[in-house]
Amino acid sequence: MGLWLSLCGAVVVVAYLLGSFPTGYIAVKQLKGIDIREVGSGSTGATNVLRTLGKGPGAFVLGLDCLKGVLAIALVDYLFNFATSQNLIPTTVNVQLWQPWLVTLAGIAAILGHSKSIFLGFTGGKSVATSLGILLAMNWQVGLATFGVFAVVVAISRIVSLSSIMGAIAVSIVMVVLQQPLPYILFGIAGGLYVILRHRSNIERLLAGTEPKIGQKLTTETEQSA
């Protein structure tokens, strides 16, 4: 059991490190020579990269951040497949019960890694794209439904933060409707709340009517309050 618990713990740590990989920071540093945390909203996520570098780099970072979430969950699947083939799973372990919980822990670790990166002094992004990758890997129907909510809201409002918040609210509802395992539902609730909390400054700007739409940049006054 000790070896099994160590393997599970290692997967969670690696998931955090995957989430911590600072794609947005590296992209802006390499292409523009500046620290993205010092411009715009200060976030290292795809939206701030979009405002700083444009659509191409923004889409690239979005894809990589999403991939980080997918890989974090794929690690869990790989562990169970490898451990099963090598007879490393103790007979007392119920795989059907353990796997959803470990998937959830790895997902939470990746989200925390993206927003609190060990490589950036525990700063980072708002974990939206990484969360989407996790959801798609957990259950593609949940991921697509959540992305659908995001897409509809962004098409109507042209405000990414509002769309992200609405998607975060929708996750747990979609999880319940599609009868997902309890750990996944708890992930939807906890992850959704965390993403919303990461958007506190955006919510303040939304209420004040100063949140920029796609294609607009934050004003100097807004940047200073972000």
From Swiss-Prot:
Pathway: Lipid metabolism; phospholipid metabolism. GO terms for molecular function: acyl-phosphate glycerol-3-phosphate acyltransferase activity. InterPro entries: G3P_acylTferase_PlsY. It comes from the Bacteria. The keyword Membrane applies. GO terms for cellular component: plasma membrane. It is an enzyme of class 2 (transferase). It catalyses: an acyl phosphate + sn-glycerol 3-phosphate = a 1-acyl-sn-glycero-3-phosphate + phosphate. It is a multi-pass membrane protein. It is found in: Cell inner membrane. HAMAP family: PlsY (MF_01043). Probably interacts with PlsX. Catalyzes the transfer of an acyl group from acyl-phosphate (acyl-PO(4)) to glycerol-3-phosphate (G3P) to form lysophosphatidic acid (LPA). This enzyme utilizes acyl-phosphate as fatty acyl donor, but not acyl-CoA or acyl-ACP. This is Glycerol-3-phosphate acyltransferase. The gene is plsY.
